[in-house]
Swiss-Prot record:
Its biological purpose: S-adenosyl-L-methionine-dependent pseudouridine N(1)-methyltransferase that methylates pseudouridine at position in 18S rRNA. Involved the biosynthesis of the hypermodified N1-methyl-N3-(3-amino-3-carboxypropyl) pseudouridine (m1acp3-Psi) conserved in eukaryotic 18S rRNA. Is not able to methylate uridine at this position. Also has an essential role in 40S ribosomal subunit biogenesis independent on its methyltransferase activity, facilitating the incorporation of ribosomal protein S19 during the formation of pre-ribosomes.
InterPro entries, per the entry: Alpha/beta_knot_MTases, Rbsml_bgen_MeTrfase_EMG1/NEP1, tRNA_m1G_MTases_N
Localization per Swiss-Prot or TrEMBL: Nucleus, Nucleolus
Example GO biological process: nucleologenesis
Site (Interaction with substrate rRNA): 84, 125, 128, 132
Gene for this chain: Emg1
Family: Belongs to the class IV-like SAM-binding methyltransferase superfamily. RNA methyltransferase NEP1 family.
Name of protein: Ribosomal RNA small subunit methyltransferase NEP1
Description of how the protein assembles with itself and partners: Homodimer. Part of the small subunit (SSU) processome, composed of more than 70 proteins and the RNA chaperone small nucleolar RNA (snoRNA) U3.
Catalytic activity: pseudouridine(1248) in human 18S rRNA + S-adenosyl-L-methionine = N(1)-methylpseudouridine(1248) in human 18S rRNA + S-adenosyl-L-homocysteine + H(+)
Residues with PTM Phosphoserine: 5, 16
Amino acid sequence: MSAASGGFQPRERRFSVQEQDWETTPPKKLRLGAGSKCGGRRLIVVLEGASLETVKVGKTYELLNCDRHKSMLLKNGRDPGEVRPDITHQSLLMLMDSPLNRAGLLQVYIHTQKNVLIEVNPQTRIPRTFDRFCGLMVQLLHKLSVRAADGPQKLLKVIKNPVSDHFPVGCMKIGTSFSVEDISDIRELVPSSDPVVFVVGAFAHGKVSVEYTEKMVSISNYPLSAALTCAKVTTAFEEVWGVI
């Protein structure tokens, strides 16, 4: 669901598995805690099928990606085009920087191709650069959590599957797919006071295929990247809920 990224390739950089502290973005309003099952209006986004896995290179671990490890992937019979952690990075930047998240009305989960489920604390500030994001993901996948720099709060943590166990009871669960024939106006799907789940594919090709969604929708006449899908969804919710 994501177009190939252009521009300059990141400089070669290796990461050892060392625990680091990461910044938080303080909210303007009191927000629901990460993973809260209580009611109240809230958008829950699941980045499904994310390519996040580590590989040992020499004595260090790196986040596997198509640019840095192409020859290794080909040697093991894997399509480099399917190993795109940058899609998750771009999507997280869109989501966590959104006014909807700053207002305390967004919760994000990441479900990887390797069946690892990650909960993202709404106060997490995603690294701006891809290299730093890779280091963060290596730390998370090996330590199972990443804490805030100013306290014991966990900003990212690996949690127990399935993701549906972490949803508010009775909430609507919607998947996004370009293959759906009819186009939906996202604003018409926004509930006035209830939580709702949107599932966005965090991969380069294919479609979302999960058992827990109740309906699938297409939101554009054109195929969209995962990051743009996230931006359109959060913007629609901001418009309906009056988040400026």
